[in-house]
Amino acid sequence: MGSQLVTWDSSTKGAGVTLDSSKLTFTITTDSVKSTIGKTYGKWYCECTINSGSNGAMIGIADSTVSMTGTLFASPKVYVYYQVSGGLYSNNQGPAYGSSYGVNDTISILLDLDNKKLEFWKNGVSQGVSNAN
C-alpha cells in the first residue's frame, strides 16, 4: 500500500482561510478548511502545529457535507477539539475532554473509522479516546 499526499482543499475552504502554494500550511481568521481526501473506513492519522494566532482554534473532523463557514461545532457531523477550553465539541455540546493548547503545540488526530473511535493528542500525550458516530 503506497502513501498518499493529502493537502488542504482550496475548493472547500471558507473565505477567511488563506492557503500557501503547497496547500500544506494555512492562515485562518475565520471559517475552516477540509483536506483533499475524505475517508469512510480504516485507521488514519494526521497532525498540525499551531504557529501563531488567537485562542479560538478548533481542530477536528467533519462529514463531507458540512460547510466550512459558520459555526461548525453546532453540527452533529463534526467533532472538534477546542483550543481555549480543551473541550471536545459536537452538536453544540462541549464536555470536558483534554487540556487547552496554543502556539507551538502539535495536535494529532487518530481516527479509527472501523471501530468508531476518535483520539486527539497534544504534544505526544493522549487527551483521551472518544466515540465518533
Where are these regions (language model features)?
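PRY/SPRY (B30.2) beta-sandwich protein-interaction domains
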Residues: 1-133
